[in-house]
Amino acid sequence: MKVSIVICAYNEEEKLPRCIDSVIAQTFSNWELWVINDGSTDSTAKLVQQYAEQDHRIHLHSQENQGLSSARKAGIECAQGEYLTFIDADDYVGELYLEHLLEPLHQHPEAQCIQGGHLRYENGNITKVAAPETSHFSPSEVITLSYHPRPIWAVLWESSFMKQHLDSIPEHINLAEDIVITLQLYPHLKNVYFSPYADYHYFIHGTNMSYAQRSVLDLLKVSSAVNKCANLDYWKNSDFVFSLQFNFIAKLLKAVSHSSASTSDLVSALRQLPTPHISIQFLKRSIGYGSYFYTWLLKHRCYKLLVYLAKIRFK
């Protein structure tokens, strides 16, 4: 069995060597690595080519800059292994990463998705986010768990499943695209397994752009995608997805409040949002009354009032 590893990189010449070296160090050796160079203007491509010349398992695919979700799709198309996994270029994995993710396959060869844990590094603090003990859940059961797999990385995906549902992965989303991809793919899964190990090292850097700094357009794209998912029958009883929808609407409104665009332009932007899904059953346990009210205004297309309130509330 071969595992395809996909690393999407844009101007990552400084951090990429650590990531690639962690792949080379894997105790499970039957892997191939595809580095998708998404239009880098630094030495990323040259660096990967040097690695490829030393290890035949390493491959470079270069394309014009199209964004992270498009790069991930390119990686899926390139993958030749039976299973695949994503690693972000500025992260790295422990040497047992692949071995641990493959472990459930010994007893459950039908597995389409195996979710592992990760270590989160932020502001000098390390937080362990562990998946449940190795066990099987149907996708509909998974969404009720307090632990819910949002990232697309730290996951072993069945390659044929990913290729079959390639069209479910939205393009040109550069913010929280891994969350959106997960929400799009889960309704198609037959099963989900968990590996309790946290071998993935996830870094939140001080240079990362905050949501407040993101453009209205970026947040509009991701909020629209999450709203569409929240309206799917599959997700309508999910506290997690319902809260996620409110979360991105709030971030969008905060960006609106800091935008220099005219009210008419902001109203035009908000009109592009799919109607959000709201349900009174979630109000007391998940959402504050203010956020619920803003979403109610969106649902009833009170765009001018919403822009006015956002300017007051978030400034």
Give the positions of each predicted feature:
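Conserved nucleotide-sugar donor-binding catalytic segment
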Residues: 139-216
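Membrane-interface aromatic/basic loop that binds lipid-linked glycans or pyrophosphate carriers
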Residues: 258-315
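Short aromatic/hydrophobic "clamp" motif used to bind/position activated sugar donors
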Residues: 84
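Glycine-rich, basic loop-to-helix element that forms the pyrophosphate-binding segment
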Residues: 63-79
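Catalytic core of nucleotide-sugar-dependent glycosyltransferases
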Residues: 198-205, 211-238, 250-276
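Short, well-formed alpha-helical segments that are part of the catalytic scaffolds
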Residues: 12-25
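Flexible acidic/His/Gly-enriched loops in nucleotide-sugar-dependent glycosyltransferase catalytic domains
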Residues: 94-171
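A conserved acidic beta->alpha catalytic loop
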Residues: 22, 29, 37-46, 88
